[in-house]
């Protein structure tokens, strides 16, 4: 992918696996927010899968298990904003720790829509970098909750979807694959 004049690296070792039910929920979230940007959190597991072609090498499969559509603090057709860190923290704790069925899950992605296109905006890229930094400092909101998240961006018009991760100090595109439940 060429993005803003330079080629974006594709991270082939990381894949997001999305089942049809969650994909449908992403679309509903976008439809309900339109013409504004939709946003939400994706929870699931990260599986380390051995690379059979190369010894001591692994792939990382982000398996989507649950999607939570959120109402942004400020509605806009060009951005989404969630400022209430306590609410965000409570949602993450509830989805990953409180519910006994979710003990193995963690936050694996941040979802939002764009009115047109699936490329990250400059604001998206700044937020990816900030959340990576936020994961490295001491605070009350789960230090590693925002590390290595996949940002999933959906085109609000045609429902195309792309994923991105801030990894090895750069924004990289990840493949999103469909999977059965």
Cite the ranges covered by each PLM segment.
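Conserved beta-strand-loop surface patch within small alpha/beta domains used
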Residues: 2-107, 115-181
């Amino acid at each position: 992918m060429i993005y803003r004049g330079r080629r974006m690296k594709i991270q082939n070792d990381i894949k997001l696996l999305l089942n049809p039910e969650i994909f449908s929920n992403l679309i509903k979230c976008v439809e309900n927010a339109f013409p504004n940007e939709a946003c939400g959190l994706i929870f699931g597991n990260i599986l380390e899968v051995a690379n059979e072609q190369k010894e001591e090498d692994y792939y990382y499969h982000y398996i989507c298990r649950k999607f939570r559509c959120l109402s942004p603090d400020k509605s806009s057709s060009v951005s989404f904003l969630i400022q209430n860190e306590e609410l965000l923290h409570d949602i993450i704790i509830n989805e990953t720790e409180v519910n006994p069925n979710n003990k193995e899950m963690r936050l694996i992605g941040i979802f939002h829509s764009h009115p047109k296109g699936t490329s990250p905006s400059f604001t998206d890229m700044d937020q990816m970098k900030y959340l990576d930094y936020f994961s490295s400092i001491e605070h009350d909101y789960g230090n590693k909750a925002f590390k290595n998240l996949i940002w999933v961006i959906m085109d609000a018009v045609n429902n195309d979807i792309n994923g991105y991760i801030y990894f090895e100090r750069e924004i990289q595109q990840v493949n999103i694959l469909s999977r059965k439940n």
